[in-house]
Curated annotation (Swiss-Prot):
HAMAP family: RNApol_bact_RpoC. One of its GO terms (cellular component) is DNA-directed RNA polymerase complex. DNA-dependent RNA polymerase catalyzes the transcription of DNA into RNA using the four ribonucleoside triphosphates as substrates. It comes from the Bacteria. Belongs to the RNA polymerase beta' chain family. This is DNA-directed RNA polymerase subunit beta'. CDD domains: RNAP_beta'_C, RNAP_beta'_N. One of its GO terms (biological process) is DNA-templated transcription. The RNAP catalytic core consists of 2 alpha, 1 beta, 1 beta' and 1 omega subunit. When a sigma factor is associated with the core the holoenzyme is formed, which can initiate transcription. Binds 1 Mg(2+) ion per subunit. Zn(2+) 2 binds at residues 1077, 1268, 1275, 1278. Keywords: DNA-directed RNA polymerase, Magnesium, Metal-binding, Nucleotidyltransferase, Transcription, Transferase, Zinc.
Length: 1649
């Protein structure tokens, strides 16, 4: 079986899909919301599960069943339209929904900041308002038209202020302010009883007001009689005594002609009828009051006869003053003189109005009374006086306000929600005239006003359709030119510039990815394949469905309803509402809950939308793509397997059979060369029934087939190792005891998982890279990790220990002497000697005094390390193992470990080690020590009482006394127990098997001082020990610590786990990509001292495992340094192993500060060290003075000046590192400090102070990942040694993950504690352990402890001054003599002394320093060094050893990004974070391409333009220089250059699109940044990796706009797309290596059997 791999996927691109693309993915349109038919359970046609669209539900069978079977594959059934294929298609084939109205994609609308908002330049809130058909709350004045003049307005029609302002610009008409009526009281009732009078009048807006007057009246009645002549008219005013009717003389009536008389008594009239022969007509006379006829009825009369008598009518006088009112019965007739004559008796009243009310009613009111009607108080006059929301002018309003006070309210301004629209098209002239432009948002009232004035020259719309029009109208090229032009005018740091740059970036991204902006508005929605959103039948016949189906259903329902509404020509408002609902439905399908309230199911649980399927821990990325399940695996409890070799494990038979089933089956079939189905069945049965032959085959297969064992939590790579399985009975996996430390396993019920590597390549990797015998050395620190412990150590110690009298026994007194080791063995076997008896043995021609136990142990040790006079405890065994590994390699070491294990277990058993309480001897010294301490404490108390000590000092002294006493008791106890070397407790502690001196002290000495809950030490110690027992008080004091310990452990585990996740995330892509990046930079090797002066790391540890960046010169000879023992030369690229590190770390020589010398100018040679002129000379009038540095230029000038010799002063110490502190003899000022690189100024200061010589070491520059210049990852040389095998690291090694694991794995051992150093407020709390590590990795701005001060210069502490307020100031004099002042905050203490020398970055006070401050004031190297020291210190304090290079990788990632200050001519924005190497590369490319500008200008002539050219001309106008497809001429080129166009995109002869730069570009200006690890992992190059970390939708949105390509450089990205990671054997350079599994030949198989 051969296996190779090729990388299938080179990159993954994400883009915005166009409607055409969405439809091209689809196999059909989903038109119905139905899913499955409830009767047949078959998918509904055109529904969400339609077989025609998505493929058949049964394999190779159409829906109607006409075609069945694979032979019809590809046939489309003509009955049901289903294509015959595998049901797998239902996981692949997509559908789509064609939307009736466009819908905005919520990701682009609601990203933060919103992409559509930035692109269109419309604020996000307003944009959302447009999309969701929102309104705008407007308060505006009301105006009413009073004179329309020549317009189409009607008198009385109302306008709002905004409309009026628009109309009045073009039209002439008059308006007055108006009000709107609110809550008028109804109905109108009369407040008095009285008579009704009704009248009508018109207002100035031609609207009618009806007046109802009600009057309450007092009346004087006067009777009037026929014939009376009235002096007054109805309504006239009279005074009392006025004559209404004057006295009048009535003459008799005479007959006018001959005739007959008729008297009518009822009407009081007399009629004369003429004779029938006469032509006269009858005449009637009314008889006035008091006139009587003188003739009888029917009498005949002659002309002139008297008919009546004459009389006098009396005068009628007004009895009261008042108003005249004619009674209803009064009948009058007007006369020519204007007076009235009474025709019939009646009544006249003189009225006085007692009370009168007027009720104006607006047109439209319903009146319930009639004119003249008498009504009572409370009667209803009309249903209302005004309508709700009636508009009135101010004058009209005043009438009603006067007559109906407090019966209604009126508003002169109205607050309304006006629907808004966005302008999508506007004529240029209209735009200039109105000041509006495309994209402006106005209310629909304003829009219709503009439409009236300008017609179709202006168009506006709302909803997604409007956004789509706006996006379609965008000319991106023009927009780009406009933004670039505007950017030149604003300051780069302003907020406006940032907005413009964001917009410019989006425009450029859209152009680059060839995305049309309108694609962000959806016309069609893809429907995911049905098997990804299944519907399953649950018991009870109900169906359970994925949330997506519900969300799709809502979209289809609303879409179909909208379609119907369009067909029915529904009103605009209903259609708008339906469009809004469709938009919301699509929003919740894409990202439920992003806009407004989330759609929930009946239990109130939000439905999971497409976005929810991607993001978060449970999303597609982290759940399925990065967290896959593993096939061929099992897990079981582990038990110890002491008989195993280190590379073996015991695998339970049953488990092995299950895991290797396919292999066993294949082998069984292979044996008999059978392939038939029945044969398979038979062989399967053999396996299932567990017949012996199955196990025989299994035994054979398992040989040489490694398995992987893994124990969770997998904190580092040693938690997953390969073993060769051995079949065992039982159900538990057997584990070799020596691999317990790397797995952190014990046998108290731990479980482990087993995995089977399948392919030949995987097996090879497991066998050669992961086998446990190759993982003895830890990659964290390069020392062994698979180490014997517990009983093995105790056994080996017991074997090699001696009696206490061993050393004092003289050789002549030794009873047993042997000629050989074998002979001693015989004596032991026969019982003559015991293991620990002193014996003399001849070994290698020498007689040595030893014990038989030591002889046994020496037999397994390599020859070079045999030692017959050594007791082997844990430390000695560790050294032995490490030395064996260094000398003989990993295989011999593994064998040695197995031998140690076997011996250890055997002799631990023989030793019969037991523990009893009586084994804890209590030292007689103990009481004395305690008594002395008590006496000292009493003294202190007395001094305190007398006032010689402060409370703080007393506390500190007491603590100190008891701490010393405890230590003395500890030593005394150990010494006392050790008097009997066979004391089991002493054996356990001294060997390092279990327990330590501290625990022994507590058991048999005294428990000592305890801490209280805050961590402050309690000054009363526990004097008792556990053997004697504690008093109640002592027991109580000791509980604090125990509780705190338990709480800490629980908190630590989770914090450490999260720290590891962040570390891995930030460093995962750091892989060794090349053997050598070629850099000459490096870091200076130095002793690491933390800010408080603690030595964190010795020089030899700093050097171990690194590669030299420069040659190391011997300070004495100035030649390359040579190791005298090994003869190794320390030149560039030498890898420093353990022995080299020890040599270089301890090598130093004493050399003179200055020597005199001279240069022979006849054959000049410059000295190796720095030198200066010791005499003056002049050449060409230039004076070369004493003290000038001598270089070749000076030598040449001296030769030309005719000198033969040149006297010089040589300073050999310059460039060397001092290993001592040199003080001035005058004022004991520090001239040079330990580990200081001596510079010229320092050397001269030494010379001035008459210092003759200094002890120095060479300056050693080593390669470091911090200075590596590899484009991606790091190079082998900068990384140095792979600590797990002590070889230079291989290309492909995943050093980032190893670093993260090495730092994260011991995280749980770091304490959480924040110690008090004893003081309450005076000394700072020191944050330690995990919180401090996190504080540093996260580069916290806010530190838990007070901030310290550091020096920014190299110099001396001149003075330390304290002012009255207690503030201290430190003055530092630099080497140039300038003074620098540093103020020390009150909360911290000064950490330097007067005369002390300080170096840049050195702490001047206690307290922590912010790394960012160091970066700002010093440089990157100082920051990296500070971080390294401080992080390393956290681990060193807890006794955890981790190599610097691991921390350096994390620090490199934290310092890897730079912040763009000025993007120059690149697409970055100010504030963008970019990798340093990327910026350097881009700047280099810009500078290189700037050189080619002239040649490009020639090349571009005659080529065809791919884009039209647009730029801003001198007048600030955007102009088009050339059209797309036009040929570039000299003229066009000249114009383009003049207007500042820097790139031309053209088509060359073959039609390829090429970009030519025609103007020089500006490079990026940047500043270095220190990022916290969380931020550093988010700031990734690839979008896949970033999307899978946090903020998935945001990352994908931005990536799609950009058309981002992920080149799959990191590890996570490749895991996501499912191919090998580019690390280790997954690197491209190993891609074509063929791994063959050679078949074993028959003879070989027989041998093995």
């Amino acid at each position: 079986m051969g296996s190779t791999f090729k990388r299938e996927i080179a990159k993954v691109t994400v883009k915005v899909a166009s409607p055409e693309v969405i439809r091209s993915w689809s196999s059909g349109e989903v038109k119905k919301p139905e899913t499955i038919n409830y009767r047949t359970f078959k998918p509904e046609k055109d529904g969400l599960f339609c077989e025609k669209i998505f493929g058949p539900t049964k394999d190779y069978e159409c829906a109607c069943g006409k075609y069945k079977g694979k032979k019809y594959e590809g046939t489309v059934c003509e009955r049901c339209g289903v294509r015959v294929e595998s049901k797998e298609a239902r996981r692949r084939r997509m559908g789509h929904i064609d939307l009736v109205a466009p819908v905005v994609h919520v990701w682009y609308l609601k990203s933060s900041p919103s992409i559509l908002s930035s692109l269109l330049g419309i604020p996000a809130k307003e944009l959302e308002n447009v999309v969701y058909y929102g309104g705008k709350r407007i308060i505006e004045k009301i105006l009413i038209v009073t004179d329309p003049k020549n317009t189409d307005f009607i008198k009385g029609s109302q306008l709002y202020q905004t409309e009026y302002e628009i109309y009045s610009q073009k039209l002439d008409f008059e308006v007055v302010p108006g009000v709107i009526i609110k809550s008028p009281s109804t109905p109108v009732t009369s407040s008095i009883s009285g008579e009704v009078k009704i009248r009508h009048e018109k207002t100035h807006t031609d609207r009618e007001i009806t007046w109802v007057d009600v009057r309450k009246i007092s009346r004087a009645e006067h009777r009037l009689y026929t014939g009376m002549i009235l002096n007054v008219k109805n309504g006239d005013k009279v005074n009392q005594g006025d004559e209404i009717v004057s006295e009048m003389q009535i003459d008799p009536i005479y007959a006018p002609f001959d005739g007959t008389v008729e008297i009518d008594e009822i009407s009081e009239s007399i009629t004369v009828r003429p004779l029938s022969t006469s032509k006269d007509i009858p005449v009637t006379f009314s008889l006035p009051y008091g006139v009587k006829p003188t003739v009888s009825n029917g009498a005949k009369v002659k002309k002139g006869d008297q008919l009546t008598n004459g009389t006098v009518l009396p005068a009628v006088v007004a009895s009261v003053s008042g108003t005249i009112s004619f009674g209803k019965d009064l009948n009058v007739r007007p006369r020519e003189d204007g007076k009235y004559e009474v025709l019939k008796n009646g009544t006249l009243f003189v009225e006085n109005v007692v009370e009168e009310k007027h009720y104006p009613l607006f047109e439209g009111a319903l009146i319930y009374v009639e004119d003249g009607q008498e009504i009572n108080e409370g009667d209803v006059i009309a249903d209302r006086f005004l309508f709700e929301d009636e508009y009135l002018t101010i004058d009209e309003f005043k009438i009603f306000e006067e007559h109906y006070p407090a019966m209604f309210t009126a508003e002169s301004e109205v607050e309304n929600d006006r629907p808004i629209v966005v302008i999508t098209k506007i004529d240029d002239e209209v735009s200039v005239e109105t000041g509006l432009k495309i994209g402006d948002i106005i209310t629909d009232d304003q829009y219709w006003a503009y439409r009236v004035l300008y017609g179709e020259k202006i168009e506006a719309d709302s909803g997604a359709a409007a956004i789509k029009k706006l996006l379609q109208n965008l000319d991106l090229e023009k927009l780009k030119a406009e933004i670039e032009a505007e950017l030149k005018k604003v300051s780069k740091s302003s907020g406006r510039a940032k907005k413009l740059l964001r917009r410019l970036k989006i425009v450029k991204d859209l152009l680059k990815s060839e995305t049309k902006p309108e694609w962000m508005v959806l016309e069609a929605i893809p429907v995911v394949p049905p098997d990804i959103r299944p519907m399953i039948q649950v018991e009870g016949g109900r169906f359970a469905t994925t949330d997506l189906n519900d969300l799709y259903r809502r979209v289809i329902n609303r879409n179909n309803r909208l379609k119907k509404l369009y067909e029915m020509n529904s009103p605009e408002i209903i259609i708008k509402n339906e469009k809004r609902m469709l938009q919301e439905a699509v929003d919740s399908l894409i990202y439920n809950g992003r806009m407004g309230k989330a759609v929930t199911d009946r239990n109130g649980r939000p439905l999971k939308s497409l976005t929810d399927l991607l993001k978060g821990k449970k999303g597609r990325f982290r759940r399925n793509l990065l967290g896959k399940r593993v096939d061929y695996s099992g897990r079981a409890v582990i038990v110890v397997g002491p008989h195993l070799k280190i590379h073996e494990c015991g695998l339970p038979k049953k488990m092995a059979m299950e895991l290797f089933k396919p292999f066993v089956l294949a082998e069984l079939l292979n044996k008999d060369d059978e392939t038939s189905k029945t044969a398979r069945k038979m062989k399967k049965a053999i396996i299932e029934k567990e017949l012996p032959q199955a196990y025989e085959v299994l035994e054979e297969i398992i040989k040489g087939h490694p398995v992987l064992l893994n124990r969770a939590p997998t904190l580092h790579r040693m938690s997953l190792q390969a073993f060769e399985p051995r079949l065992i009975e039982g159900n538990a996996i057997q584990l070799h005891p020596l691999v317990c430390p790397p797995f952190n396993a014990d046998f108290d019920g731990d479980q482990m998982a087993v995995h089977v590597p399948l392919s030949a390549a995987a097996q090879a990797e497991a066998k050669f890279l992961m086998l446990s015998r190759y993982n003895i050395i830890s990659p964290a620190h390069g020392k062994p990790i698979s180490m014997p412990g517990k009983d093995i150590v105790a056994g080996v110690y017991y074997l090699t220990m001696v009696d206490k009298n061993f050393d004092s026994v003289k050789e002549k007194d030794i009873k047993w002497k042997f000629s050989s080791i074998e002979e001693a063995g015989l004596a032991y076997e026969f019982g003559y000697i015991k293991l620990h008896d002193p014996i003399l043995v001849k070994v290698d021609d020498k007689v040595i005094k030893t014990t038989y136990g030591r002889l046994i142990f020496a037999s397994i040790v390599p020859d070079e390390f045999k030692d017959y006079n050594k007791t082997y405890g844990k430390g000695a065994i560790k050294d032995l193992v490490y030395n064996t590994f260094k000398k003989y390699g990993v295989d011999r070491t593994a064998d040695l470990l197995d031998d140690i294990k076997d011996l250890g277990f055997h002799y631990a058993t023989i030793s019969g080690l037991t523990v009893s309480i009586t084994d804890f001897y209590i030292s007689p010294e103990r009481e004395k020590i305690i008594e002395q301490a008590k006496a000292k404490v009493s003294e202190i108390e007395e001094l305190f009482a007398e006032g010689f000590l402060s409370d703080e000092e007393r506390y500190r002294e007491t603590i100190k006394i008891w701490a010393d006493a405890t230590e003395k008791v500890q030593d005394a106890t150990f010494e006392y127990i050790g008097k009997d070397p066979f004391n089991p407790i002493y054996i356990m502690v001294d060997s390092g098997a279990r327990g330590n001196k501290d625990q022994l002290k507590q058991l048999a000495g005294m428990r000592g001082l305890m801490a209280d809950p805050s961590g402050r030490t309690i000054e009363i110690p526990i004097i008792s020990n556990f053997r004697e027992g504690l008093s109640v008080l002592e027991f109580f004091i000791s509980t604090h610590g125990a509780r705190k310990g338990s709480a800490d452990t629980a908190l630590r585990t989770s914090s450490a786990g999260y720290l590891t996740r962040r570390l891995v995330d930030v460093a995962q892509s750091v892989v060794v990509t090349t053997t050598d990046c070629g850099t000459h930079n490096g870091v200076r090797a130095t002793v690491l001292k933390s800010s408080d002066g603690l030595t964190v790391e010795k020089l030899e540890d700093f050097l171990f495992g690194r590669v030299l960046a420069k040659d190391v010169f011997d300070p004495k000879t100035n030649n390359v340094l040579v190791n005298p023992e090994t003869g190794k030369q320390y030149t560039r690229d030498t890898i420093i192993d353990d022995d080299d590190a020890k040599f270089l770390g301890n090598y130093s020589v004493r050399i003179p500060v200055v020597t005199e010398g001279e240069i022979d100018l006849s054959s000049p040679e410059l000295p190796e060290s720095y030198c200066e002129l010791a005499e003056d000379f002049v050449y060409n009038d230039v004076h070369y003075e004493v003290g000038t540095e001598v270089n070749w230029d000076v030598v040449r000038k001296a030769t030309s000046a005719g000198l033969s010799k040149l006297k010089v002063k040589i300073y050999p110490v310059v460039g060397k590192v001092s290993v001592e502190t040199v003080l001035s003899s005058k004022d004991s000022k520090q001239l040079v400090v330990d580990e200081e690189l001596i510079e010229v100024t320092t050397a001269k200061i030494l010379e001035e102070n008459n210092v003759e010589s200094v002890q120095v070491r060479p300056e050693i520059i080593v390669r470091s990942v911090l200075t590596c210049e590899a484009e991606h990852g790091v190079c082998s040389k900068c990384y140095g040694m792979d600590l797990s095998n002590h070889q230079i690291v291989g290309v492909g090694e995943s050093v980032g993950v190893v670093a993260a694991q090495s730092i994260g794995e011991p995280g749980t051992q770091l304490t959480m504690r924040t110690f008090h150093t004893g003081g309450i407020a005076t000394t700072a709390d020191i944050t330690q352990g995990l919180p401090r590590a996190e504080e540093l990795f996260e580069a916290r701005k806010k530190l838990k402890e007070p901030e310290g001060v550091f020096s920014r210069v190299k110099g001396y502490v001149k003075d330390i001054v304290e002012d009255e307020t207690g503030r201290k100031k430190v003055y530092i004099e630099d080497e140039a003599g300038d003074i620098h002042e540093y103020e020390i905050p009150i909360k911290v203490k000064v950490a330097v002394n007067k005369g002390q020398k300080v170096l840049p970055g050195q702490s001047l006070s206690t307290g922590a320093i912010r790394p960012r401050k160091i970066l700002e004031t010093l440089d990157v190297d100082a920051t990296a060094l500070y971080l390294l020291k401080e992080i390393k210190k956290v681990y060193v304090e807890q006794g955890v050893d981790i190599h610097d290079k691991h921390f350096e990788i994390i620090i490199k990632q934290m310092l890897d990004k730079v912040e763009v200050v000025d993007p120059g001519d690149t697409d970055y924005l100010p504030g963008d974070l970019v990798r340093l190497e990327t910026v350097k590369r881009i700047n280099k490319e810009i500078l290189e391409s700037n050189v080619q500008v002239d040649s490009n200008r020639k090349r571009v002539i005659g080529k065809e333009l791919h884009h039209h050219l647009i730029a801003e001309d001198e007048n600030g106008q955007i102009v088009e220089i050339a059209k797309e497809g036009e040929e570039v001429t000299e003229e066009i080129l000249e114009k383009a250059i003049k207007l500042g166009i820097k790139d031309l995109v053209v088509k060359n002869g073959e039609g390829e699109i090429v970009t030519y730069q025609i103007l020089p570009k500006e490079p990026i200006k940047y500043r270095r940044r220190l990022l916290r690890i969380t931020k550093a992992s988010l700031e990734r190059v690839g979008w896949l990796s970033a999307a899978s970390f946090q903020q998935t939708p945001q990352v994908l949105t931005e990536a799609a706009i950009e058309g981002a390509e992920d080149l799959l450089l990191g590890l996570k990205e490749n895991v996501i797309v499912g191919q090998l990671i580019p690390a280790g054997t997954g690197l491209d350079m190993f891609a074509n290596i063929q791994i063959e599994e050679t078949p074993r030949f028959a003879q070989e198989k027989e041998k093995m059997a």
